[in-house]
């Protein structure tokens, strides 16, 4: 057994008819998780139903249908491999689900693959002012996805036209640049998800295509196929390499043990003997022990739901929504204010400065005031407007926000799980956002005896 491949998550986005299912199905079918038995079963059913042209979308339709009926689908079916990576496909089915999943972080994508239909009229429909193509790409960027691959699909229906391909590349480069992606770092690949051209193997139908290239910090990369473009994704920084961030879900008082905060390690690691700090409570103390499922852990890793015992801290000092961090390694601090990119999803009216809804960010649930609308992008006209008077559904805006009581959040680029939030009002999610920058409060807090002793060691 060699070393296990790095895992990456990709989200496949694009207009409903762009051929997302066929393309994704093709990759999964050829490089991945569907075992031969399942495929034979599907092929037999397809033939019986007269879908003899059994193509890859059918695989996906079957998987989706089974998933919707509540049959638990072996999630391995949504995986495929490239030479370097184990890839998990995050399906972006319903628009609302997609947004919700991306925000709650059930699915943090490392890269988005934007599938564009190259056929005459189709591309224009997808990209028109209200097309999903634009909106999905804007959402992916707003939600922190910084790597993009553009696959121009259905090239077979354009008679493999180089002119059509170039026209689309030019148009798409323009709109993704407006959103914030750098087109030079985005591979563009002309494909046919149906026939398989440039999917895994170089197409013989497009001799004019000399290959894609993308510029990265590490230098430029080139390739011919969609699979190679996926293999050229920059590897994500694993959360265990970052400093500790552990948002508290609850704090218990356990007889004979003392105060036990509980929460999920989002980044970094936690272990006994560590001197931790809680923000915004500004309490510093030593971790005596770490447990998961009633067993002692030597260290808690990202994704672990742990309980840990802290000395000399009362249950009154810390609470749900506080963030635990390593006092010696970029400790978390209270946020005085922060600027965020916010997308208004469904709000019946106009939102102007002064609006103060509740924000759900990690485990914190706190009202925050939209203190200043800095700029907005109208999603239909794509116009930028500085200091707008108001924003409405469909707008994307940069907003300065001020929490109504002490809160600890982080910039999305530093600590993704602490940098995205949902805005709740009228019992629904009216907006979602990603934090760009945080103004932090420096304040001396309470240091327990245990912490003082531990830090002298």
Swiss-Prot record:
Modified residues (N6,N6,N6-trimethyllysine): 79
PROSITE patterns: G_TR_1, G_TR_2
Residue span of region G2: 70-74
GO-annotated molecular function: GTP binding; GTPase activity; translation elongation factor activity
Region feature (G5): 192-194
Keyword GTP-binding: yes
Primary site of residence: cytoplasm
Record has Membrane as a keyword: no
CDD domains reported for this sequence: EF1_alpha, EF1_alpha_II, EF1_alpha_III
Region annotation G1: where it falls in the sequence: 14-21
Residue intervals of the tr-type G domain: 5-240
Residues covered by region (G3): 91-94
Signal peptide start-end: none
Positions bearing N6-methyllysine: 3, 30, 316, 389
Cellular location(s): Cytoplasm
Annotated positions of the N,N,N-trimethylglycine modification: 2
Keyword list, A-Z: Cytoplasm, Elongation factor, GTP-binding, Methylation, Nucleotide-binding, Protein biosynthesis
Gene Ontology, cellular component aspect: cytoplasm
Domain of life: Eukaryota
Region named G4: 153-156
SUPFAM superfamilies linked to this entry: EF-Tu/eEF-1alpha/eIF2-gamma C-terminal domain, P-loop containing nucleoside triphosphate hydrolases, Translation proteins
Residue list for modification N6,N6-dimethyllysine: 3, 316
Function summary: This protein promotes the GTP-dependent binding of aminoacyl-tRNA to the A-site of ribosomes during protein biosynthesis.
Family assignment from sequence similarity: Belongs to the TRAFAC class translation factor GTPase superfamily. Classic translation factor GTPase family. EF-Tu/EF-1A subfamily.
PANTHER family the record matches: TRANSLATION FACTOR
Name of the protein this chain belongs to: Elongation factor 1-alpha
């Amino acid at each position: 057994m060699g070393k296990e491949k790095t895992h990456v998550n990709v989200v496949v986005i694009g207009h409903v008819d762009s051929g997302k299912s066929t393309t994704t199905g093709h990759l999964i079918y050829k490089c991945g998780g569907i075992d031969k038995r399942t495929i034979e079963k599907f092929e037999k059913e397809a033939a019986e139903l007269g879908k003899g042209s059994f193509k890859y979308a059918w695989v996906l339709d079957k998987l989706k249908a089974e998933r919707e009926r509540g049959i638990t689908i072996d999630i391995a079916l949504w995986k495929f491999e490239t030479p370097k990576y184990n890839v998990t496909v995050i399906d972006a089915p319903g628009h609302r689900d997609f947004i919700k999943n991306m925000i709650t972080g059930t699915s943090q994508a490392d890269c988005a693959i934007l599938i564009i239909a190259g056929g005459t009229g189709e591309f224009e429909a997808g990209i028109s002012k209200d097309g999903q193509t634009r909106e999905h790409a804007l959402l992916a960027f707003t939600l922190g996805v910084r790597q993009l691959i553009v696959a121009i699909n259905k090239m077979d229906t354009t008679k493999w036209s180089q002119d059509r391909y170039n026209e689309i590349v030019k148009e798409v480069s323009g709109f993704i640049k407006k959103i914030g992606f750098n087109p030079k770092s985005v591979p563009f690949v002309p494909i046919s998800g149906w026939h398989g051209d440039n999917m895994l193997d170089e197409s013989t139908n497009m001799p004019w295509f000399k290959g894609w290239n993308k510029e990265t910090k590490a230098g430029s990369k080139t390739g011919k196929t969609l699979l190679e473009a996926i293999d050229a994704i920059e590897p994500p920084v694993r959360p265990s390499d970052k400093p500790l961030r552990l948002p508290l879900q609850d704090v218990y008082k356990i007889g004979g043990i003392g105060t036990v905060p509980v929460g999920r390690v989002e980044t970094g690691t936690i272990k006994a003997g560590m001197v931790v700090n809680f923000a915004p409570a500004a309490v510093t103390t030593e971790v005596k022990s770490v447990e998961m499922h009633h067993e002692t852990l030597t260290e808690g890793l990202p994704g672990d739901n742990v309980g840990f015992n802290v000395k000399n801290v009362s249950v009154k000092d810390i609470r749900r929504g506080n963030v635990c961090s390593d006092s010696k390694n970029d400790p978390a601090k209270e946020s005085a204010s922060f600027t965020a990119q916010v997308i208004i999803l469904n709000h019946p009216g106009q939102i102007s400065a002064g609006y103060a809804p509740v924000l759900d960010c990690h485990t914190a649930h706190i009202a925050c005031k939209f203190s200043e609308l800095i700029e907005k992008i109208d999603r239909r006209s794509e116009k930028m407007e500085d200091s707008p008077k108001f924003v409405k559904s469909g707008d994307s805006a940069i907003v300065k926000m001020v929490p109504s009581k002490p809160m600890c959040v982080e910039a999305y680029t530093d600590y993704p799980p602490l940098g995205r939030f949902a805005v709740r009002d009228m019992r629904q999610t009216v907006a979602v956002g990603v934090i760009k920058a945080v103004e932090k409060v420096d304040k001396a807090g309470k240091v327990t005896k245990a912490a003082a002793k531990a830090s002298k060691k």
